[in-house]
Amino acid sequence: MSEPSSRPLACLDANIFLAVLIPEATRAPKDEIAGSARVLKAVEEGRLRGVSTAILLGEIRYVYLREDKAGFEIARAAIEAESNLRVLTITASLAIHAAELRRTYYSKKNAFSYNDGLYLATGLAERADLLITTDPHLLSVANLKTLRPSQYR
């Protein structure tokens, strides 16, 4: 395995995990679901380092509840046990930066959410090489290179 610094660091949005965990609950096309599986496999194998924000777990939990699905605790344990993935606590500075990013990107035509701001703020704070998402609001940001999971090779 290569040195950690030589492997790209990707900030991962919840939709990457949800596409694999509960594909029937996502609006993502099949190529994005397959791409999400490739991304998570690369993290698991150590070819890609991942980082996300603790809101990830809240978003995943919500979908499990909304879809009335069992298995959240198993998914959570797997995420928390993954050695190539860091899930950051939401600190005051991260929360404030997320609000500032929301102010920058939100408009009537772009419903950039506070959660979107948390993912972007996390990626920027951790100096991620890219942010992988299917969210059109995040794919249009200028602060960080973004990639659809289907584009990850």
Give the ranges of each region predicted by the language model.
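Acidic, PIN/NYN-like endoribonuclease modules and their adjacent C-terminal/linker elements
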Residues: M1-L9, L120-R153
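Active-site neighborhoods of divalent-metal-dependent phosphate/nucleic-acid chemistry enzymes
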Residues: E3-S5, L85-L130
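Short, well-structured N-terminal submotif of metal-dependent ribonuclease cores
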Residues: M1-S52, L65-I74, P136
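A generic structural signal for short hydrophobic patches within well-formed alpha-helices
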Residues: F17, L57, A95, L138-L139, ...
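Conserved glycosyltransferase catalytic-site signature
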Residues: A14, A54, S113-G117
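Conserved beta-strand segments of alpha/beta enzyme cores
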Residues: R49, N84-R86, K145
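Residues that scaffold the ATP/ADP-binding catalytic core of kinase and kinase-like folds
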Residues: A19-L21, V63, V141, P149
